[in-house]
């Protein structure tokens, strides 16, 4: 196979890897950590392979120094990791759990010492159980204030140490799998609720980014997105239109809001089918 190098990567390109708190940390009930919706969801029979869970995972909480040493050995330039909301606020709000905050400060310092740029994800799907039980989590606009306050604590605590932030990790995944396919918490199959949850997540994302700029945090912030392109199978105009509509429904439904603050027309037309008349003014 012939490989052609079209352009060299710049020297400051951030080669790295990423994880999520629930995927790697373990220590699910240690040092004051509260329960998340994933702690409950994995205990529902049939929801995970062989009833596996993240109670221990790879024990990153206790072995992060070894893990960072391995990252350095690999030559990573950056490491993106998420914060477990329930380590900072065990009930989703209230008093800060200092032990949880100290863990992430120690991890960040270890990364910096190893010459690895820390990149922080504020939310990677592990919503505090308390907020889900109190007001339905992402189904209530109350979460906007709670998420923003949580983010502000992290912005201030990591100021000057973390320069790259991800507000929401793959919003299209946690809204679709949580509220359309029931493969993620809270295990719902309801298009109407999915569209409403997604809109509230958009508002929360914007609120957190605005807070970041209001606090004059040095760095960059934005959401991440799980993008899968859609191509027409041939040049038939009907198939080209179908591919364009699929792009609207599966990608631009999120990306257009992030970039332009508007939903694409095709996606709005579909979502309005599933949204009852009294609800519509709140969503457009």
Residue ranges and their predicted role:
Residues 83-96:
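Glycine-rich, proline-tolerant flexible connector loops at the mouths of alpha/beta enzymes
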Residues 12-14, 61, 78:
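A common structural microfeature
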Residues 2-48, 91-93, 101-276, 280:
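Active-site region of glycoside hydrolase catalytic domains
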Residues 80, 87, 277-279:
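Short, cationic motifs built from Arg/Lys/His that form the positively charged side of catalytic pockets
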Residues 35-69:
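Aromatic- and Gly/Pro-rich amphipathic surface segment
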Residues 63-84:
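Catalytic domains of carbohydrate-active enzymes, especially glycoside hydrolases
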Residues 55-56, 95-96, 197:
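A generic structural signal for short
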């Amino acid at each position: 196979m012939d490989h052609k190098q079209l352009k060299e990567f710049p020297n400051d390109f951030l080669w790295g890897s990423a994880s999520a708190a629930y995927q790697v940390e373990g220590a699910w009930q240690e040092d004051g950590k509260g329960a998340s919706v994933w702690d409950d969801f994995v205990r529902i029979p049939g929801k995970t392979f062989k009833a596996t869970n993240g109670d221990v995972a790879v024990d990153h909480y206790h072995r992060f120094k070894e893990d960072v040493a391995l990252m350095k050995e690999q030559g990573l330039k950056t490491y993106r990791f998420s914060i477990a909301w329930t380590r900072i606020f065990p009930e989703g709000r209230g008093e800060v759990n200092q032990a949880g905050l100290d863990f992430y400060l120690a991890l960040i310092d270890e990364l910096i010492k190893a010459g690895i740029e820390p990149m922080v994800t504020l939310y990677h799907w592990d919503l505090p159980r308390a907020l889900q039980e109190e007001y339905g989590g992402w189904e209530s606009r109350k979460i906007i204030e709670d998420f923003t306050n949580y983010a502000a604590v992290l912005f201030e605590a990591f100021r000057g140490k973390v320069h790259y932030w991800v507000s929401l990790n793959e919003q299209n995944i946690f809204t679709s799998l949580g509220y359309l396919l029931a493969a993620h918490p809270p295990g719902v199959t309801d298009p109407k609720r999915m569209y409403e949850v997604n809109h509230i997540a958009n508002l929360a994302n914007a609120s957190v980014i605005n807070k970041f700029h209001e606090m004059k945090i040095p760095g960059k912030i934005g959401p991440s997105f799980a993008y899968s392109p859609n191509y027409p199978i041939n040049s038939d105009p009907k198939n080209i239109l179908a591919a364009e509509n699929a792009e609207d429904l599966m990608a631009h439904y999120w990306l257009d809001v992030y970039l332009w603050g508007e939903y694409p027309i095709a996606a709005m037309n579909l979502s309005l089918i599933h949204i009852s008349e009294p609800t519509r003014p709140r969503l457009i």
